[in-house]
Amino acid sequence: IFAPYFKFNLMNKLLIVGTVAFDAIETPFGKTDKILGGAATYIGLASNFFNVDAAVVSVVGEDFPKEYLDLLENKGVNIEGIEIVKGGKTFFWSGKYHNDLNSRDTLVTELNVLADFNPIVPQAYKNSDVVLLGNLHPIVQSGVLNQMSERPKLVVLDTMNFWMDCALPELLDVIKRVDVITINDEEARQLSGEYSLVKAAAKIHTMGPKYVVIKKGEHGALLFHNKDVFFAPALPLEEVFDPTGAGDTFAGGFAGYIAQSENISFSNLKNAIIYGSNLASFCVEKFGTERMETLDKKEVNARLKQFKALTQFEIELEE
């Protein structure tokens, strides 16, 4: 009788903080009405592929369907940290992607209950091994770290240019406190003031993070640690349907792998980046969370083999 409970307690804890939201997406391939979205949603769905005890801290309105919360719970995500605001409306984002899918226009952003979000970390997760701070106001991200009962083994921060524009001092404060930052190439250049990504990463290291992950969308991701650099390719896909959530899925795969393996070394972070890229490659195949909802471990492992083949080569180097 006690075995499952006992096993559950032995799993490493992953605390995920981010948005749980409604999205409406338009791409050259079609458009959706309001569907399930939000960074913490994608991160949570990605964490399901690892042997971790994951919990989401977020906020939704009374208009948020119970079936969406059930979906997360059925995928093994603890949802006690998702606050439901009576009479409130859930955060809503609508965007339209251009033909190349690399750029998009935000059509609507309604913060709704997110405007007053004050995250409360459930007692059982105040000692989480890994904390993933999804893209939110830096003050909210700092507020989460302040609630931890002990320093997590790894803190991963995701942020974006919006916060660099309107909350830079607060952002720099939280960056000081994290081990890993994940941003895209444009954001790395903006944050550092350096065009070369190698120089940008070196500058960001001096702000606090030991590891800098620079996401380059369909061109993969770079991992920097002091003088070490690793490049993870993105799998060339025949069909890219909707890039929404790919970056969050990547972060969820990255953090989930680290939380499961407990090994925080450069060589293991390389594996984590491959796991993140692998999961993100599935996410883009359908609208919203649709593909991540049906994805199984067999498919994930089969594609991991493709990732390995993508970059394996044998060259005999003469001394």
Model-identified regions with their sequence ranges:
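Short catalytic helix/loop segments, enriched in acidic residues and glycine
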Residues: 30-45
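Glycosyltransferases and closely related glycan-assembly transferases
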Residues: 1, 142-155
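Conserved phosphate-binding/catalytic region of the ribokinase-like
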Residues: 197-319
